[in-house]
C-alpha cells in the first residue's frame, strides 16, 4: 500500500478478489459514465456485460487492477485497470468517484505508484478514450499521448505516447 497526505491508498486487486469488489468498482464506473457515454441499457445489464468482460480480461497475468481507497479499504474511491505487453503499457480504464476527482493529488500519486511497479522495458504508453469524453482526451494529451486511430466500432480514439513522456509529466507537472 502507498499513501498520500489525504490517506488515499493504492493496492493491487488480487484476481481471486474480483467477485468481492466487482459491484463497488462497477458502481463508480456507472456513476461516472451515465452522463458521458450512456449505453441505453439498464444498470444490471451493463454490470453483467462489464463483469463478463473484466473476468475474461483478468485471466491474463499482464492485466491488473489497482484499487484506490481512502484508507485501509474503508471506502473504495476508484480504480485503475491496465495491462503490459512487451514494451507497451496500456491504460485501460481509470475511474475515480466524482467527489474525489481533482482532489488530494490522486491522479498524479496513482501514476507514481504505477511507475514503481511496471517493467523497465516499457517504451510506449497507449490508451483508448471515448470520443465524447473531452476531459479524458485532454488529460491523455497532457500525459504525452496523441491520437493515432480509432477502435473497431469508431466510438473511441486510440492514443499513443512514449513512456519517457509519461515519466517526464510525472516528474514535472500535475494534471
Locations of regions flagged by a protein language model:
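Conserved N-terminal entry element of GNAT/NAT acetyltransferase domains
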Residues: 1-27, 165-175
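Acetyl-CoA-dependent GNAT
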Residues: 12-16, 23-92, 97-99, 111
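Short acidic/glycine-enriched loop/turn segments that link adjacent beta-strands
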Residues: 87, 133, 153-156
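Short loop/turn motifs at secondary-structure junctions
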Residues: 90, 121-123, 144
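Conserved acetyl-CoA-binding loop-helix of GNAT-fold acetyltransferases
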Residues: 96, 102-116, 138-142
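Conserved GNAT acetyl-CoA-binding A-motif
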Residues: 118-129
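Conserved beta-strand-loop-alpha-helix junction that forms the acyl-donor binding cleft
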Residues: 127-137
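Conserved catalytic-core motifs of GNAT/GCN5-like acyltransferases
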Residues: 128, 144-162
Amino acid at each position: 500500500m502507498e499513501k498520500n497526505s489525504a490517506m488515499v491508498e493504492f493496492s493491487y486487486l488480487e484476481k481471486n478478489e474480483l467477485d468481492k469488489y466487482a459491484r463497488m468498482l462497477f458502481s463508480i464506473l456507472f456513476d461516472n459514465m451515465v452522463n458521458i457515454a450512456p449505453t441505453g441499457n439498464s444498470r444490471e445489464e451493463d454490470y453483467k456485460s462489464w463483469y463478463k468482460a473484466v473476468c475474461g480480461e483478468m485471466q491474463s497475468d499482464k492485466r491488473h487492477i489497482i484499487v484506490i481507497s481512502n484508507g485501509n479499504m474503508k471506502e473504495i474511491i476508484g480504480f485503475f485497470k491496465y495491462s503490459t505487453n512487451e514494451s507497451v503499457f496500456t491504460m485501460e480504464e481509470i475511474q475515480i468517484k466524482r467527489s474525489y476527482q481533482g482532489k488530494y493529488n490522486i491522479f498524479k500519486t496513482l501514476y507514481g505508484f504505477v511507475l514503481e511497479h511496471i517493467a523497465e522495458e516499457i517504451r510506449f504508453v497507449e490508451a483508448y478514450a471515448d470520443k465524447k469524453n473531452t476531459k479524458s482526451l485532454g488529460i491523455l494529451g497532457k500525459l504525452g499521448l496523441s491520437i493515432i486511430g480509432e477502435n473497431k466500432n469508431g466510438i473511441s480514439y486510440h492514443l499513443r505516447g512514449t513512456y519517457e513522456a509519461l515519466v517526464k509529466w510525472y516528474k514535472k507537472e500535475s494534471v
